[in-house]
Amino acid sequence: INILNRNSNDLNKHAADFKGMRYWSPKFILDQIDILSRMGIKTLRIADEMFFLNKKYYIPILEGIIERGYDLNMWAYARIDTVREDQLELFKKAGINWLALGIEAGNQNVRLDIEKGKFKDVNISEVVKLIQKYDINVLGNYMFGFPEDNLSTMQETLDLALNLNTEHANFYATSALPGSPLYFQAKKNNWELPSKYEEFA
């Protein structure tokens, strides 16, 4: 739904280096949903991890979905450190029945090293329970193999996933995708990386 507004094509820059974001207007997004709705599509995935970071963009979209009465079944991504209780009722009313959370790791030091937010201020279990309180299902995303990981920290991640027991869970092997901070860390440390883009898949 939004596009990273790069102001440089420097290969040594990663996504966090670019502050600007170009957004489609709420009207444009709603008109696209209208097209899908007329085709009989009821289930939508908002595959945009940044969608819920800016209220002035997502609130008009969700309110528009409610006003137009689409009766959708949607799922969306959210960062574990940006979930806000005052918005969850709106999410549910608009038809967001699933939130996929980037929980990533069970160990706090590993989470802090990921550079995705102030995880130290977040009680993951409370966030999951809060979302579920609004009858929204949680999909937990976990990753194994961060640079700070070892067998003990990866066991913590598995234990956290088992304890949270979310409605669904995905487990991934960490990959240093081109443009990510981990990619540049790997290059700097001369870690072996795939030679072709398709090999990152």
Where do the language-model regions lie?
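Basic phosphate/pyrophosphate-binding loop/patch that engages nucleotide-derived ligands
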Residues: 159-168
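Short alpha-helix in the alpha/beta-hydrolase fold that links the catalytic acid
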Residues: 153-157
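Radical SAM [4Fe-4S] cluster-binding motif and immediate context
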Residues: 1-139, 146, 159
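Flexible glycine/acidic-rich beta-alpha junction loops that bind and position SAM and/or redox cofactors
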Residues: 4-5, 56, 109, 114, ...
